[in-house]
Amino acid sequence: MFAKAFRVKSNTAIKGSDRRKLRADVTAAFPALGTDQISELIPGKEELNVVKLYVHKGDSVTVYTSGGNPILFELEKNLYPTVYTLWAYPDILPTFITWPLVLEKLVGGADLMLPGVVVPPTGLPQVQQGDLCAIALVGNRAPVAIGVAAMSTAQMLASGLKGKGVSVLHTYQDHLWRSGDKSSPPAIAPLDPTDSCEEKVHLGLQGNLKSLTLDGEEENGQVPLREASEDTSSRAPSQDSLDGKPLQEQMDDLLLRCFLHALKSRVKKADLPLLTSTLLGSHMFSCCPEGQQLDIKKSSYKKLSKFLQHMQQEQIVQVKELSKGVESIVAVDWRHPRITSFVIPEPSLTSQTVQEVSREQPYLPPDIKSLYCVPANMTQLFLESGHKKGSTLEGSEVRKIITDYAKRNRLVDADNRNLVKLDPILCDCILEKNEQHLVTKLPWDCLLTRCLKNMQPAYQVTFPGQEPILKKGKLCPIDITLALKTYNKKVTVVRNLETYGLDPCSVAAILQQRCQASTIVSPAPGAKDSLQVQVQGNQIHHLGQLLLEEYRLPGKYIQGLEKAPKPGKK
């Protein structure tokens, strides 16, 4: 609901009577809150504001703010807590658990699909269809989203955990969260941690549970969790086994594991020399086991450069400063015992979850319209037709407005109806200063062309089943370029995938498999919050097949396809 910017209608301090009514409504809506907690949430004397706003879908929403943070919002006479409130009182709603990678999808406006739900040993929370519920991530009880259950718990289990689980209304990092102090979720330990004895029983029964899964039987949704435990144990020591180690030693082990995993499964000889920052950002982070987070500052090395110096001393890699202040890995000994003895883990449960979700939601190309915004100096021309500064119009609408304006003001030349006389308003809108006293008439096509040229470009992108997204400026096409790296090696670089609803990481994974070439996802230079995909070699032919044939994007939105290798040439 708040994935896109909203428009504030009013912001006023709450009245005393309204404050008392709100306290009563909160008591009725959230019976798990005690009297003291309600007094903390809605204090008697501290400032409390009521904000009326319109979300991008047009719904009217009332938001209650305290201390600069939104604490509650009301939609269709129903009260909902924000993530700020849930961080203070995490147990007032039934909570579903999901993987950290799913959060990005939720922030982008997606609902929580059941394949992405992690089932704890105690089973799913008991909800009925339409019940308010929260969503938290594995390892942290602090909710990151709220929504309403799309089906009851019984229906979820009966469906085999397929389909939509929670219709999401508000998330951490959405625009409602941004209206507050933008704090991050606190670390809240999960309730009822698994007993160590029980964990041993679980590990002993994993083989039986796996066979039960193959037979299609699940009881209380416990199998996926134990499969996850099995998967984690194959890649890294379990959390229970690590509890005896200091945190710094745990992070050292995790850092080495991610490093060896990246070298053995992701980095190829053709990638060298490889920036150390790229090794960390594009390879090591993605090799981190589920439920764990790689943080070099918590290791004994503190910095990546010190860790790589240690790896160089062990003669696993060779690091050089090829340009001032920028280190690169120039050589890797793939025969080193550390690398050869490392066992690559099985695909994680999360990657399977992402694949299931993507299968349920296949990519469909968006509908794209070119639009024009009314600038300040052309406001008078569009005022009579009910449009003001900033209004967006299609080209056909602009043509009709200009035509109607000329006819209504009798500006069509009587002797030559292909010409339009320019009145003061048209002169100010379309003529240059040196033309003001020289040009008195223009042909229709020239008049319309000049009007469109002087208006500000915009575009509207509409994905199937979603609200239109309106953006000002020119629509950037998907940009495919070839670049030469060290030793005259070619790489294919793709930018602007996000504009068309394409996930750069997903595209990189597909290209890596089809082209049998290494890929790197990195921040796009000069573009805020945008990523680029780099593929080893000239892979434009494969890209063209993927974008044009499978994703069915129109060719006019893709530039650089002509650089594909010609048939018969390598």
Curated annotation (Swiss-Prot):
The keyword Cytoplasm applies. One of its GO terms (cellular component) is cytosol. One of its GO terms (molecular function) is RNA binding. Keywords: Acetylation, Cytoplasm, Initiation factor, Phosphoprotein, Protein biosynthesis. Residues 478-548 form the SUI1 domain. The keyword Acetylation applies. Residues 370-454 form the SWIB/MDM2 domain. The modification Phosphoserine is found at S238, S241, S348. PANTHER family: EUKARYOTIC TRANSLATION INITIATION FACTOR 2D. Belongs to the eIF2D family. This is Eukaryotic translation initiation factor 2D. It comes from Mus musculus. The gene is Eif2d.
